[in-house]
């Protein structure tokens, strides 16, 4: 089992690091009390090989942490991070978000809470494998640093999901891009094609011979190829492109299949789903 532990000062980006780990397939637990670590690992040992936890100052003590890490189950590979930021940056972040610092009390100012946490966590910062100062990093920079440490590369695999649907059954709420193909020639009006779907060869042949269909597929491909690099740089994990026709049987299915084939030739992981066909 591989265990990644994320610790550090409140407001330094622990939740961002944990989201990166979740995107990489880790089972993540936020703010885990250290006494529960053994129980968690025991429960997960047969179901997952990748586990990530974050701990904050409220449930972390130097001696307790050292003891827990030295008594991990046999075969556990540990990688640890400590995230830090300057006092000035943390003050600014908390002032902007108006969140309550974990060590804030009724008579404790934000500055005093930040100072106190720095002192408490200084010994812990010396126990970890990777120390990251996030003072001058945005969330994308931090995500890339964590990913590079874990994978040796900042390249992120974007999963592209092409989904066909019928407008008469409602639009998919999860779509990032949506294209309406109801203006394209409709196989429904060809009696021999009506009972078929866009997965059947006669329908595919009919639509492949329509210049407007081919041009529209080319234009969608060109649009997506232009903007995919920008989406990847913003650390997108999934992209759903919905293609809709009237009933979700012919045109949208065909266009979805063609786009999925085109993008399967690239570095991306591509999925094709036909909502109305799967509901039959």
Curated annotation (Swiss-Prot):
Positions annotated to bind GTP: 56-59
Record keyword Membrane present: no
Entry's Gene Ontology molecular function annotations: ATP binding; GTP binding
Covalent S-S links between cysteines: none
Alphabetic keyword roster: ATP-binding, GTP-binding, Nucleotide-binding
Domain of life: Bacteria
Chain positions recorded as ATP binding sites: 8-15
SUPFAM superfamilies for this protein: P-loop containing nucleoside triphosphate hydrolases (SSF52540)
HAMAP family referenced in this protein's UniProt entry, alphabetically: RapZ_like (MF_00636)
Job description of the protein: Displays ATPase and GTPase activities.
NCBIfam families: PRK05416.1 (NF003828)
Recorded family membership: Belongs to the RapZ-like family.
PANTHER family reported for this sequence: RNASE ADAPTER PROTEIN RAPZ (PTHR30448:SF0)
Protein known as: Nucleotide-binding protein Swoo_4243
């Amino acid at each position: 089992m591989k265990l990644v532990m994320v610790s550090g000062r409140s407001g330094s980006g622990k939740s961002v690091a944990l989201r990166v780990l979740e995107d990489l397939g880790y089972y993540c637990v936020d703010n885990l009390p250290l006494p529960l670590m053994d129980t968690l690992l025991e429960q997960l040992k047969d179901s997952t090989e990748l586990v990530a936890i974050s701990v904050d100052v409220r449930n972390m003590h130097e001696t307790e942490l050292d003891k827990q890490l030295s008594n991990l189950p046999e075969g556990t590979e540990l990688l640890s991070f400590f995230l830090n930021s300057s006092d000035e940056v943390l003050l600014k972040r908390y002032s902007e978000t108006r969140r309550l610092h974990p060590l804030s009390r009724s008579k404790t100012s934000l500055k005093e809470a930040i100072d106190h946490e720095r002192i408490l966590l200084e010994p812990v910062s010396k126990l970890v494998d990777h120390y990251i100062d996030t003072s001058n990093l945005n969330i994308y920079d931090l995500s890339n640093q964590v990913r590079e440490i874990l994978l040796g590369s900042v390249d992120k695999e974007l999963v592209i999901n092409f989904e066909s649907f019928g407008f008469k059954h409602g639009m998919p709420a999860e779509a990032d891009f949506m294209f309406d193909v109801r203006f394209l020639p409709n196989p429904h009006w060809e009696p021999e094609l009506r009972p078929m779907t866009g997965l059947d060869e006669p329908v595919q042949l009919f639509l492949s011979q329509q210049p407007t269909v081919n041009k529209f597929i080319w234009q969608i491909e060109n649009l997506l190829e232009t903007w995919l690099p920008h989406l990847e740089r913003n650390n997108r994990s999934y992209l759903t492109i919905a293609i809709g026709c009237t009933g979700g049987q012919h045109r949208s299915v065909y266009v979805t299949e063609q786009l999925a084939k085109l993008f399967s030739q690239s570095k991306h992981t591509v999925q094709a789903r036909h909502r109305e066909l799967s509901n039959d």
